[in-house]
Amino acid sequence: MNVPNLLSLSRLILSPLILYFVLEENYLSSLVLVLFLALMDFLDGFFARKLNQSTRMGKILDPLADKVFTFFSLLSYTFFSKERLNPLIFFLLLGRDITLIIGGIFLIKRKFTPEPSIYGKFTTLFVSLSLLSVGILNVYDVNFLRILTNVLEIVSLILILVSWVDYTLKGFKMIFKE
C-alpha cells in the first residue's frame, strides 16, 4: 500500500474518534484531530500527485475517507457539542450527497463521468470553515468568532443549495444530451 492510500485509510479509521472526543467533552482533542485529519487529506492528494502514486484504490479510498470525515465532523459538531453547527447544514448536505450518489451511479451506468463543480468546491471550503469555527468555539468562547460562524453558516447553506442545483442541472444535461 502506498503512502497516499495509507493516509486515506488512516483518515477513514480515525474519523469516528472525532465523535468520541466530542461525546467525552474533550473539545480540544476533537479540534486537534479535525485539523490533523484535514492536513492528512491535503497530504494524501499532494503525495499522490508529486510521487505519481494515484491508484484505482486511492480514487475510491480518498473520497470515501472525505465523506466519513465530513459525516463524523458534522454529526459531532451539529448534534453533540457544546457549541453547535446549524442542523440545516447537516440535513441539506445529506440530501445533496444522497442525490449525488444516486445520480452518479445512474450517470456511470450510462457511461458518463460526473464532473466536479466549482460550487461544490466552495461548499466544501465554507462548510469546513464553519466546522473549524464551531470547533474553536467549543474550546475558546470568542464573541467575534460566534458572529463569524453565523456568517459562514449562512454562506454554507446558500452554497449547498447552489451546488445541489448545479450538480442536478449538469446531470440532467448529460442524460438528455444523448
Swiss-Prot record:
InterPro entries: CDP-alcohol_PTase-I (IPR050324), CDP-OH_P_trans (IPR000462), CDP-OH_PTrfase_TM_dom (IPR043130), CDP_ALCOHOL_P_TRANSF_CS (IPR048254), Phosphatidylglycerol_P_synth (IPR004570). It catalyses: a CDP-1,2-diacyl-sn-glycerol + sn-glycerol 3-phosphate = a 1,2-diacyl-sn-glycero-3-phospho-(1'-sn-glycero-3'-phosphate) + CMP + H(+). GO terms for biological process: glycerophospholipid biosynthetic process; phosphatidylglycerol biosynthetic process. The chain crosses the membrane at residues 28-48, 88-108, 125-145, 147-167. It holds the Pfam family CDP-OH_P_transf. Keywords: Cell membrane, Lipid biosynthesis, Lipid metabolism, Membrane, Phospholipid biosynthesis, Phospholipid metabolism, Transferase, Transmembrane, Transmembrane helix. GO terms for molecular function: CDP-diacylglycerol-glycerol-3-phosphate 3-phosphatidyltransferase activity. One of its GO terms (cellular component) is plasma membrane. It is found in: Cell membrane. Pathway: Phospholipid metabolism; phosphatidylglycerol biosynthesis; phosphatidylglycerol from CDP-diacylglycerol: step 1/2. Its EC number is 2.7.8.5. Gene3D superfamilies: 1.20.120.1760. PANTHER family: CDP-DIACYLGLYCEROL--GLYCEROL-3-PHOSPHATE 3-PHOSPHATIDYLTRANSFERASE, CDP-DIACYLGLYCEROL--GLYCEROL-3-PHOSPHATE 3-PHOSPHATIDYLTRANSFERASE-RELATED. This is CDP-diacylglycerol--glycerol-3-phosphate 3-phosphatidyltransferase. It comes from Aquifex aeolicus (strain VF5).
